[in-house]
Amino acid sequence: MAYYPVQMRGMNLKKLLLIFLLTFSCNTMAEWVEYSTRANGDVYFFDKARVQKNGNLVNVWNRIRYKTSVMAASSYQSLIKIDCSEYSETTLQSTFYTDKNWTTPAMATNTREKPKVFIKANSASERLADNLCQ
């Protein structure tokens, strides 16, 4: 058994605790709920714990796990704003991941707001909006 001074043992424990907290704190606070599985096998989730409603506007974190890789991406996460009064959505930020568990970004997060689009009938977005705009 290796001998480490008391100060060094405490420092290693602090580093280990910090790594543990950083690794698991974000996912433990999230409550990902599956809301759609498309015919192509893609599975959609939203984070129920971080839904923010302000009048007719709803901000929600959204995830997609692709059945087959899309341009080297196996999963996707975005923050979207849904306007319940006009049934539209705006992507506020988005990240593609090379793995199916949203841990390895394929590129930097895109923080540019995308143009508003109207929600299409029979889409995953419609199912999400129907759920959140009640």
What are these regions (language model features)?
Residues 28-78, 83-134:
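N-terminal secretory-pathway/extracellular module detecting exported/lumenal segments
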Residues 2-16:
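Positively charged n-region of N-terminal signal peptides that target proteins for export
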Residues 1-4, 20, 30:
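Short, solvent-exposed linear motifs at loop/edge-of-secondary-structure regions
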Residues 16-24:
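Sec-dependent N-terminal signal peptides
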